[in-house]
């Protein structure tokens, strides 16, 4: 089932692999998504523990498939029924990776040559996602680290666990294990930056398909780029080159508190001594007349442990447990999508990426299999979204 929420937004209800198979090849400019991580979140199997129903694959010819994953007739029997929770089982990890590869293969097909895909992953399982994306045919170009300061550690108190263990009815001493735990505080989410291989050179590809590069100028780090921060003195003209580390406000404050302020002198762009030096670039950099904490070198976005009501739609008591900040998703969409382009999110959730795309002057296609989340997307767009005035005039300009 497909729903047209705006002229610029279409949402498909169904399994992402099945829906993607029905989309034309080379029909989207970018993919920005937050797929299942293959873990449990705060005790909730928010990934959808029944992934197994949609990962029946014919991998009977795969010699790499772990023992125990084959069905009674030699075919591949998905083990990703456990993908909704983190498991140390190689079989379950393999099943999650194979499922990621299956949807990534379809994502590769529907992307235009040179199109980028940004896909978030979990810190414990994103290596499986990255391998799957690469095995599907993408080039892994980079990774982005989204740092935040509001994570909650899920750790076992080792001393308490030892103290509660009893041998022959006697308590075991736990003094030696005071202060020990089993987990770190989660403070980052990785994002795989992948690109469908180019057809020819970068110049050939962008002229033919309109994609293939990153919109650097639209994502530069400006001195006044974050509200409510006192980390800058002075102002940059064009802004710094965007980095592959993104901060929330709390992470930015912590970074600035632990490091002294520094200044950047004003000057002209530096040039290589000879043409072709500096990795083929004549201009090799510029100086900035500003000063402040080290957070000024990174993009900073407002983050709340629980997204505000404006960014977290709720219908009938149902809400999505993992809503990314809208400003973050707008920055990512802007980075990899030409103005007026089509953004695809195969795991739409409550529709944050779709809203981000529209707000940035792009079209959006979303896929969501959970019926309970569809009203959240409808509610998000029913509240009204500021749409660039010339967005809907693009049809007449490009047709």
Question: What does each model-found stretch correspond to?
Answer:
Residues 1-399:
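S-adenosyl-L-methionine-dependent nucleic acid methyltransferase catalytic domains
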């Amino acid at each position: 089932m497909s729903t047209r929420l705006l002229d610029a937004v279409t949402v498909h209800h169904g399994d992402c692999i099945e829906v993607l198979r029905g989309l034309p090849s080379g029909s989207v400019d970018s993919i920005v998504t937050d797929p299942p991580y293959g873990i449990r979140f705060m005790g909730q199997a928010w990934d959808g523990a029944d992934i197994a129903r949609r990962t029946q694959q014919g991998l009977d010819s795969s010699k790499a498939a772990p023992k125990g994953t084959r069905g009674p007739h030699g075919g591949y029997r998905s083990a990703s029924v456990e993908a909704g929770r983190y498991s140390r089982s190689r079989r379950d990890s393999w099943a999650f990776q194979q499922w990621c590869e299956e949807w990534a293969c379809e994502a590769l097909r529907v992307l235009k040559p040179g199109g980028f895909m940004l896909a978030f992953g979990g810190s414990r399982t994103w290596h499986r996602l990255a391998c799957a994306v690469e095995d599907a045919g993408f080039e892994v170009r980079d990774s982005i680290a989204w740092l935040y300061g509001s994570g909650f550690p899920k750790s076992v108190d080792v001393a308490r666990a030892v103290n509660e263990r009893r041998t022959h009815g006697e308590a075991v001493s736990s003094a030696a294990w005071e202060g020990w735990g089993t987990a770190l505080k989660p403070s980052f989410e990785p994002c795989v930056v992948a690109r469908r291989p180019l057809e020819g050179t970068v110049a050939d590809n962008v002229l033919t398909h309109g994609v293939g590069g990153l919109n650097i100028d639209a994502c530069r780090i400006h001195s006044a780029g974050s509200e409510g921060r006192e980390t800058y003195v002075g102002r940059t003209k064009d802004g710094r080159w965007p980095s592959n580390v993104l901060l929330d406000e709390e992470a930015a404050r912590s970074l600035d508190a632990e490091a002294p302020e520094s200044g950047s002198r004003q000057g002209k762009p530096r040039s290589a001594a000879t043409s072709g030096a500096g990795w083929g670039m004549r201009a090799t950099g510029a100086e900035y007349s500003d000063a402040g904490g080290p957070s000024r070198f990174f993009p900073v976005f407002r983050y709340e442990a629980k997204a505000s009501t404006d960014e977290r739609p709720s219908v009938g008591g149902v809400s999505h447990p993992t809503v990314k900040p809208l400003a973050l998703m707008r920055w990512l969409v802007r980075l990899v999508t030409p103005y007026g382009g089509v953004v695809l999110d195969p795991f739409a959730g409550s529709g944050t990426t779709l809203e981000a795309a529209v707000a940035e002057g792009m079209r959006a296609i979303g896929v969501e299999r959970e019926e309970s989340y569809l009203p959240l997307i409808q509610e998000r767009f029913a509240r009204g979204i500021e749409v660039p005035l010339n967005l809907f005039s693009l049809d007449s300009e490009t047709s």
